[in-house]
Amino acid sequence: MHLRNVPTCPEILGEAALANEPDIKQVFITGFTETETADRKLYLIRKRIENKVRLSAIPTRNDFYVVSLSTKSIIYKGMLSSLQLRNYYPDLTNSYFTSGLALVHSRFSTNTFPTWGLAQPFRLLAHNGEINTIRGNRGWMEARESVLSTPVSYTHLRAHETL
């Protein structure tokens, strides 16, 4: 495992973004032999970390957010315009880093106060509209949990349980 401080250029941020700029780290975990198994393990690791932080006495626990922990993607996000992104993250202009795909989403929230954690993209989606019914969507999914299935059988994957 390697922990990396992500290089940033905070001087390009606006006043609100700078006042709330998070500490940005990247974790690289090696030793996996199969991508599918690695993704499952990384998911469980992420959930365990999130639950431990959520249940801790850390004063900034409500601001903690794992942007990505995946074999497939690295996400760079912030309270930034798309033009600011490459200037804020020098990695994005470093020729050492290559990518087969880049997705930039720059729409700002219209009915919630902007925060780093709510900035686009999220781990699994970027969208062009507000998702106003998160509570409703969670309730809908929880009501159908008993009919959901996966070929991988482990019952401890419920996101709201402590791992």
Model-identified regions with their sequence ranges:
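Extended, highly charged
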Residues: 1-100, 104-110, 157-158
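A short, polar/charged loop-to-alpha-helix boundary motif
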Residues: 141-154
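Short, acidic Gly/Pro/Ser/Thr-rich loop/turn segments
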Residues: 110-111, 141
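Anion-coordinating catalytic cores for phosphoryl-, nucleotidyl-, and glycosidic chemistry
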Residues: 114
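Conserved phosphate/anionic-ligand binding catalytic regions in large, soluble enzymes, centered on
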Residues: 122-140
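Conserved small/polar residues in nucleotide/adenosyl-binding loops
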Residues: 155-163
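Short, small/polar residue-rich loop motifs at catalytic or cofactor-binding pockets
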Residues: 118-119
